[in-house]
């Protein structure tokens, strides 16, 4: 029985490695395709969502209320440190909704959103015109910034697609000032968690907090379902829409998080003083 379980685990790990490599190669094409299909559509969030029990109930403007559950994931991640008046970098900013919300609400001195998708960055520049907020095209594994340039680095639901997560962590530490914060949330399948934890432990950063948030993300996805399905309807080719709704990545992620075969976590790290 133990050998059988080990073989199943090995099979799943190999399958995950193959799937993630395909996803990593495809992500630039997929995100560019989505951005171009959406054109001037007002889809500014690409994350699953987050809701606590009892509900968070953070006050939002009427325009932000439409994206409440996606915003709440950003709010909870950023609220792990005081970023008011600080220089903040978000790696993997997507369509800039989180960057816009945090720049307006948490009042950093500057907020820089970086993403690999050049079409997405162009979308962000057109859509989000806020003092102190800028968007830069670049690679998470080769950040185009000087050493010790930021007081906080934020990364939301993005790092699972980086080919070299360890290199990304090294870059985060490089661009952070001593005493700066790495505010981080993402998910991994259970058989990839040991490697995830090793990379985080080996990074030149000190962990301040960690918690599993499967319940909150699943709850957010359930409440955000109409918005997620609406995006699929607008982006996916007509012949594939029903299949994607039933079997696509969002549906698969929901089932894996609900069944705890994937774990979603939220972290806060600090760069030690020199």
UniProtKB/Swiss-Prot annotation:
Keyword Methyltransferase part of the UniProt annotation: yes
Enzyme class: transferase
EC numbers on record: 2.1.1.15
UniProt similarity note: Belongs to the methyltransferase superfamily.
SUPFAM superfamilies in the cross-refs: S-adenosyl-L-methionine-dependent methyltransferases (SSF53335)
Annotated GO MF terms: fatty acid O-methyltransferase activity
Keyword annotations: Methyltransferase, Transferase
GO aspect biological process, one term: methylation
Gene source species: Mycolicibacterium smegmatis (strain ATCC 700084 / mc(2)155)
Protein known as: Fatty-acid O-methyltransferase
Catalytic reaction(s) noted: a fatty acid + S-adenosyl-L-methionine = a fatty acid methyl ester + S-adenosyl-L-homocysteine
Keyword RNA-binding: no
Annotated knockout phenotype: Cells are unable to methylate the glycopeptidolipid fatty acids.
Disulfides per UniProt: none
Function: O-methyltransferase that modifies the hydroxy group of the fatty acids. Oleate is the most effective fatty acid acceptor.
Matching InterPro entries: Erg6_SMT_methyltransf (IPR050447), FAmtase_mtf2 (IPR054916), Methyltransf_11 (IPR013216), PthPhpthDimycoMt (IPR054877), SAM-dependent_MTases_sf (IPR029063)
Pfam family, one: Methyltransf_11
Record PANTHER family: GERANYL DIPHOSPHATE 2-C-METHYLTRANSFERASE, ZGC:194242
């Amino acid at each position: 029985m133990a050998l059988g379980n080990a073989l199943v685990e090995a099979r799943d790990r190999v399958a995950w490695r193959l799937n993630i490599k395909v996803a990593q190669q495809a992500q630039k094409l997929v995100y560019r395709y989505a951005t171009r299909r959406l054109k001037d559509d007002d889809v500014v969030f690409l994350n699953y969502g987050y809701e606590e029990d009892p509900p968070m109930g953070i006050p939002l403007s009427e325009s932000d209320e439409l994206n409440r559950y996606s915003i709440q994931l950003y709010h909870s991640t950023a609220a792990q440190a005081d970023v008011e008046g600080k220089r903040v970098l978000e790696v993997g900013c997507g369509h800039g909704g989180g960057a816009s919300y945090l720049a307006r609400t948490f009042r950093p001195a500057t907020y820089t959103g970086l993403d690999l998708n050049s079409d997405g960055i162009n979308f962000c520049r057109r859509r989000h015109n806020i003092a102190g907020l800028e968007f830069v095209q670049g690679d998470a594994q080769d950040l185009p910034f000087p050493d010790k340039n930021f007081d906080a680095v934020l990364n939301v639901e993005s790092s699972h697609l980086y080919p070299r997560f360890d290199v990304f962590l090294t870059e985060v530490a490089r661009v952070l000032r001593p005493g700066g914060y790495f505010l981080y949330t993402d998910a991994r399948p259970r058989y990839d968690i040991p490697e995830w934890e090793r990379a985080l432990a080996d990074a030149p950063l000190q962990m301040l907090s960690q918690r599993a948030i499967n319940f909150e993300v699943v709850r957010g996805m359930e409440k955000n379902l109409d918005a997620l399905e609406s995006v699929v309807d607008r982006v996916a080719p007509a012949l594939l829409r029903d299949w994607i709704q039933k079997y696509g990545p969002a549906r698969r992620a929901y089932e894996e998080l609900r069944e705890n075969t994937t774990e979603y976590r939220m972290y806060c790290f600090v760069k030690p003083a020199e």
